[in-house]
A protein has these predicted regions:
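Active-site-proximal, structured, solvent-exposed surfaces of multi-pass membrane proteins
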Residues: 3, 8-9, 633-859
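Hydrophobic alpha-helical membrane-insertion signals
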Residues: 7-79, 465-477, 481-506
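Membrane-embedded helix bundles of polyisoprenyl
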Residues: 22-26, 113, 117-131, 136-218, ...
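Membrane-interface coil-to-helix junctions
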Residues: 23-121, 144-165, 253-258, 265-291, ...
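Periplasmic/ER-lumenal interhelical loops and adjacent helix-loop junctions
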Residues: 46, 50-51, 57-59, 92, ...
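Membrane-interface micro-motifs in multi-pass membrane enzymes
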Residues: 82-86, 107-119, 145-172, 179, ...
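Contiguous transmembrane helix-bundle modules in multi-pass membrane proteins
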Residues: 182, 201, 322-339, 348-475, ...
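Extracytoplasmic/lumenal acceptor-recognition loop(s) of multi-pass membrane glycoenzymes
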Residues: 448-468, 483-552, 586-588, 593-619, ...
Length: 859
């Protein structure tokens, strides 16, 4: 056994080094950056903190409690967990979180980054070893150039993507085997794993594979078509095998806001120089950007030289050079053409993470460069003279970049790139002068390449930054105690009044309303906006609640921290550690019967107070809940109003940004509970003062704000600072409203009388009873989803969407038992396809094995 291990280590030492060297490097970075357990920091930056970590917490709880994987009530009033799992969490490597406590989750995920990046280096090295035909140091260098390129470093926080990058080299080697040996098993399984782990990034891989196959050097037309059928067949088979994940994921993502087709109108983003400069040594990795033309392209200066060398040498056929070049040029154009980028991104906008498919270009460039390197090491010494063509080409490209770049080019990156080229050229010169033997020369340039890549990775992770877990998770223990005490079932909803992370309530697995994620339903986002909550493209937060919407959504508790200054209508319950619990003064329920008139509800008005008034009136037959309070025109500074509709909407132009560009003043003529709502996309910051004292500040637009119990004579001032950008104009719409407390009491009483009584809640199944006074609509504060099956007294009934967002059913007069069961749409069909796919691949493998045995017998 020992000898066998020694043989493996000897035969595969460089392949193993391609994994362990990045691990050592990245763990060294972790120690230097004080990543847990070496400190309190974490690699979980940007959305990894605000989205992915909370989703992992929900997943971990499900794994440990063996809860249903179909649905979760821990976000968004309830969401399709399987759809979200397929988008963010499906990698088998993520199952490691079931082995650790929640307190270790941030640490485990930080080091899972390390493992996944190292595996990307390993699979790339495996591919290059197969191309080279031997185990040598070059596979380590080029493998690390892939796994530690600026794309991987900058976007490493997208931990759910890494398996797709990891599988790409294996998929491409699988295509080689499929074409050359007519064996598609590796290709099929590698693509299956990629599709299973992240269907969205795998979609980009699939587009790339079509191009790769079309430009592959086929022997003849017949081979092109026969292998094409194999390629298509195994591709479809891998999709079928992953269908149990793909179908629910696809159907879920098609319900999001970003699912609407809207092709960009621009022709170009920028210039050649803007893009190519991102190849330069010393460029800072991009973690996120609003500008869709931004990109991560650095993958080594030796890569550029060897790619140029590939184009120059005579040992490679011209047609092969043209094929490789066409692929790279098309990908490069795709970076700069909005329409092509839109297609590459699955007909979706890029939303702050531009050019996500750049890893395909990087690997294609590295593959081309490695072919050039192989020619160099296999050829005679004089072949290396072609490197001067590569240097001249790089010089021309650098010159064009400096000439055409419209963004400020950091000259230090130009100097560093030129210096790196010079160092490599010295090595080539020493080799050409016969001072270095080939073995020493190739080892030296590969060593320098490793150093270059490692140095850029160290710099990149330092630039990325880290997050201090102590500051973000200091209240976890206290909130966990609150949850244990008060969150009795799914009907008990509670929320943080403000989160340190956008999805912090999900991190604590509270039955909450907040959801920030790519799988958020577009119709629900739109509805929450209409009701006065803060929303974004793929988010709706618990910011903007009123007593009515709190009751409607069954919000029973709010959690405050010392820094929270927002007013609340809830009553003080108790303090636990550093947090304070407030309780809704009204009884709430997960569902209510409503008058059939609710189907005429006008939910499309721009004023959320009107929307809530109409819902309360049509559903529960009460008078006007909110009375609009007239507000005076704002005072203006470095700003002018160009249009006024007389209803609180002002079109403006500003000449500068100052804290008091617009100042609205409300003087209360009586004691009342006052609310405001304003929309203003061009508002940079807002300060709200009450009698000269600041009570709220920050991003306060696009949500209802409760200003407390305002006394007669109180003065409210709303100061708005406008943005100083290219637009310098926009629209501000402000409305103030008074809550009618008598109507609210009557409304709460009627809602309690119409409440559905929950009797059982297990996983994806709910049941309860309702007593309808007449034929009515039963409204659930649960997002509408075709995956819900509702039965009344054991009989399945048709579900409908109120306002295109909420689950409702018609219920006849009398007392009834109502049960709900959720199964993700597409799961059953996907499971059937997956079983069929695995049966087919097993039959193919058995047939192949029998065929091999028959061939051996004939010999």
């Amino acid at each position: 056994m020992t000898n066998k291990i020694k043989d493996i280590l000897k035969t595969h030492k460089y392949l193993l080094l391609s994994f362990f060297l990045p691990v050592l490097l990245l763990e060294g970075i972790a120690i230097a950056e004080k990543i847990q357990p070496f400190g309190s920091e974490s690699f979980l930056i940007v959305d990894a903190l605000h989205q992915y970590l909370p989703f992992f917490a929900d997943y971990q709880e499900k794994l440990k409690s063996m809860d249903s994987m179909f649905y979760s009530f821990h976000a968004g009033l309830g969401y399709n967990f399987l759809g979200l799992w397929a988008y963010y969490l499906a990698s088998p490597l993520n199952l490691v979180i079931a082995l650790v406590s929640k307190s270790m989750l941030t640490m485990i995920l930080s080091h899972l980054y390390v493992l996944k990046i190292a595996l990307c280096c390993f699979t790339a090295a495996f591919y290059f070893r197969k191309r080279r035909g031997k185990d040598e140091i070059s596979i380590v260098a080029f493998g690390m150039a892939y796994g530690l390129c600026s794309y991987m470093v900058g976007y490493s926080w997208n931990i759910m993507w890494m398996e797709v990058m990891m599988m790409l080299p294996l998929i491409l080697y699988g295509i080689d085997k499929l074409i050359k040996e007519h064996d598609g098993r590796l290709y099929c399984f590698a693509l299956f794993i990629s599709l299973w782990c992240n269907f969205y990034m795998s979609y980009m891989t699939c587009l790339f594979l079509i191009l790769w196959y079309l430009l592959y050097p086929h022997k003849n037309v017949k081979e092109f078509f026969t292998n094409g059928f194999r390629f298509a067949g195994y591709s479809l088979l891998s999709g079928a095998m992953a269908a149990v994940v793909l179908l629910p994921a696809y159907l879920g993502i098609m319900q999001t806001s970003s699912a609407k087709l809207q092709f960009p109108k621009e022709l170009w983003y920028g210039t050649f120089g803007n893009l190519f400069s991102r190849h330069f040594l010393g460029t800072t990795p991009l973690t996120m950007a609003v500008d869709d033309s931004k990109i991560n392209l650095y993958c080594g200066i030796l890569t550029l030289l060897m790619a140029g060398f590939y184009l120059a040498v005579r040992e490679i056929r011209l047609i092969d050079k043209i094929r490789r070049l066409l692929l790279l040029v098309f990908l490069f154009f795709s970076f700069n053409m909005p329409v092509l980028g839109y297609v590459w991104h699955g007909f979706h906008d890029q939303y702050g993470i531009p050019n996500r498919f750049a890893f395909l270009y990087i690997f294609a460039l590295l593959a081309m460069a490695y072919e050039g390197y192989c020619v160099l090491v296999r050829g005679k010494r004089k072949v290396s003279l072609w490197i001067y063509f590569a240097v001249i080409l790089c010089g021309i490209l650098i010159g064009i970049t400096m000439k055409t770049s419209t963004v400020k080019l950091e000259m230090k990156t130009v100097y560093a790139t030129v210096a790196a080229i010079a160092v490599y050229m010295i090595c080539f010169a020493l080799y050409q002068k016969k001072i270095f033997r080939k073995k020493i020369f190739t080892t030296l340039i590969c060593f320098l390449f490793i150093v270059e890549t490692a140095a850029m990775a160290v710099m990149g992770f330092q630039e990325n930054g880290t997050v201090d877990t102590d500051s973000y998770f200091q209240d976890t223990k206290a909130i966990t105690e609150v949850k244990k005490e008060y969150q009795k079932n799914v009907e008990t909803r509670m929320e943080l009044i403000s989160g340190r992370m956008l999805d912090e309530s999900i991190w604590h697995t509270l039955n909450g309303m907040t959801l920030f994620g790519s799988t958020a339903q577009g119709n629900v986002v739109d509805m929450m906006d209409q009701l006065g909550f803060y929303t974004g493209v793929n988010e709706y937060l618990y910011e903007g609640a009123t007593p009515f919407t709190n009751n409607l959504m069954s919000m029973k508790y709010q959690i405050y921290r010392p820094y929270d200054t927002k007013y609340t209508e809830f009553s003080l319950k108790e303090s636990v550690g550093n947090v304070t619990v407030y309780k809704n003064p009204y009884r709430t329920a997960l569902a209510y019967t409503m008058d059939d008139l609710v189907q005429t509800w006008d939910y499309e008005d721009y004023n959320p107070f009107y929307v809530q008034n109409d819902l309360a009136t049509s559903a529960f037959d009460v008078d006007e809940l909110f009375h609009i309070v007239k507000t005076a025109k704002p005072q203006l500074n470095d700003c002018k109003i160009t249009s006024d509709n007389g209803d609180g909407e002002y079109v403006f132009e500003n000449t500068s940004a100052r804290p008091d560009n617009m100042v609205f003043t409300i003087r209360s003529t009586k004691t009342r509970r006052l609310y405001i709502h304003f929309d203003g996309s061009q508002v940079e910051n807002t300060v709200i003062e009450k009698n000269g004292e600041q009570v709220l500040t920050g991003r306060l637009d696009s949500q209802i704000i409760y200003l407390g119990n305002v006394q007669k004579g109180d003065e409210i001032r709303i100061k708005m600072q406008l943005k100083q950008d290219n637009e310098m104009s926009g629209v501000v719409r402000l409305t103030a409203a008074e809550l009618d407390e008598e109507v609210m009491e009557e409304l709460a009483q009627r809602m309690q009388e119409n409440a559905w009584k929950l009797t059982s809640a297990k996983g994806n199944h709910l049941s309860g009873t309702i007593h309808a006074q007449e034929d009515q609509m039963l409204f659930f504060s649960i997002p509408y989803d075709k995956g819900w099956t509702v039965k009344i007294d054991g009989k399945k009934v048709k579900t409908k969407a109120l306002g295109k967002a909420f689950l409702t059913v018609k219920v006849p007069e009398g007392k009834h038992k109502v049960s709900l069961t959720y199964v993700s749409s597409g799961f059953k069909e996907g499971a059937i396809l997956s079983v069929a796919g695995f049966v087919i691949i097993i039959l193919i493998m058995l047939f192949s094995q029998r065929k091999k045995k028959a061939a051996v017998k004939e010999i």
